[in-house]
Design a protein with these regions (language model features):
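Sec-dependent bacterial lipoprotein signal peptides
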Residues: 1-22
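Kelch-like beta-propeller repeat domains
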Residues: 24-341
Length: 341
């Protein structure tokens, strides 16, 4: 079994059947009587890393680039639930980088932006699973940046927020058919970097992030059909009811988000210290419910993905380590307080 790799670099900025082992850390944050269990899945077969990118095409997830233990990376890997291992694919042709973006549209994957150790980047590359090759596409329409969010809606890609030595809130749409970028309505609320994004009900939700020394506590939802943003309930205690008493623990940056069963989950990240609290969001009620905290080592700069309605969290870093482990979240299973690893 692989273990965490000592993190030496200071940065400027599954089934076949799939192996699932109960995760291990006793009494994760917010466990108590909360529901949800974290199980160790198949380890990522590439080098341990953080600040990588991911996209999903036809029930296959792709993961690449990022910061390893001693250097930035440009390798790429794929995984599907009908195999029990990761397969290396063609290296990312844009070169080494961390803190970039990834999304998938119409059976193709897109990756770009980020930081190569010297320069903020704005190049964008398209991956074809059929040819296992990368092709340079039109540069991103906004400024070169790091720590943006990316998502896909209605056969278009979107890149929003980020940092170019200033915090940003612009929002750009990519049309793969025309290979063109068009600026759209900017994200409401503060300019930010290191936010998280998830898709529910064919709308994009941008949550939290970092701006001017603090974690943000807002949730903004984007409707691509109308090109409008709506502010949802803030992540703070604003009612006399008990459901939002602990909402302040949701605010963080460099967290991950994933969806299952028409709900979203937010976990990991940081807010002064590493954050393992896990929260479930129900868009029909605009409410968050705390679930069992992430049971692996608390981390930031991780990735998350959903395959066949199953949610996974992988990679990331702590203050001293980078990780290659993968966890599956089982939302309706009680936490096993006797898990060990």
């Amino acid at each position: 079994m692989k273990t965490a790799v000592v993190y030496l670099m200071a940065l400027a900025i599954a089934t076949a059947p799939m192996l699932i082992i109960p995760a291990c850390r006793k009494n994760p944050p917010g466990s108590g009587n909360l529901i949800g269990n974290w199980a160790i899945s198949n380890y990522f077969d590439g080098p341990a890393r953080s600040e990588a990118v991911t996209f999903t095409i036809n029930d296959t997830v792709y993961v690449g680039t990022g910061s390893g233990s001693t250097k930035r990376l440009n390798d790429f890997w794929k995984y599907s639930l009908d195999k029990s291992y990761w397969i290396q694919i063609a290296d990312f042709k844009g070169g080494i980088r961390n803190s970039g973006i990834g999304f998938a549209v119409n059976g193709k994957g897109y990756a770009g932006l980020g930081y190569d150790g010297d320069t903020y980047l704005k190049d964008v590359w398209e991956y074809s699973p059929d040819s296992n090759g990368w092709a340079r596409k039109k540069d991103f329409g906004g400024t070169a940046r790091i720590e943006a969010v990316a998502f896909a809606l209605n056969n278009y890609g979107y890149v929003a927020t980020g940092y170019d030595d200033n915090y940003l809130k612009d929002n750009w749409q990519y049309d793969p058919a025309a290979d063109s970028w068009t600026q759209k309505a900017g994200v409401l609320g503060a300019k930010r970097k290191s936010a998280s994004v998830f898709i529910l009900n064919n709308q994009a939700y941008v949550v939290s992030g970092y701006s001017n020394g603090a974690a943000l506590n807002d949730l903004e939802v984007y409707d691509a059909g109308t090109d409008k943003w709506t502010t949802k309930r803030k992540l703070t205690n604003v009612t006399d009811s008990s459901f939002d008493d602990q909402y302040t623990s949701i605010a963080r940056w460099n967290a991950v988000a994933f969806t299952m069963n028409n709900k979203a989950w937010l976990t990991t990240g940081e807010n002064g210290s590493m954050n393992s609290h896990t929260w479930e969001y129900d868009y029909t009620t605009d409410q968050w419910t705390e679930k069992t905290g992430f049971e692996g080592t608390a981390r930031t700069g991780a990735l998350a993905f959903t395959l066949k309605n199953r949610g996974f969290v992988l990679t990331g870093r702590s203050v001293t380590d980078v990780f290659d482990n993968v966890f599956e979240f089982q939302p309706d299973v009680p936490v096993n307080a006797n898990d060990n690893y």
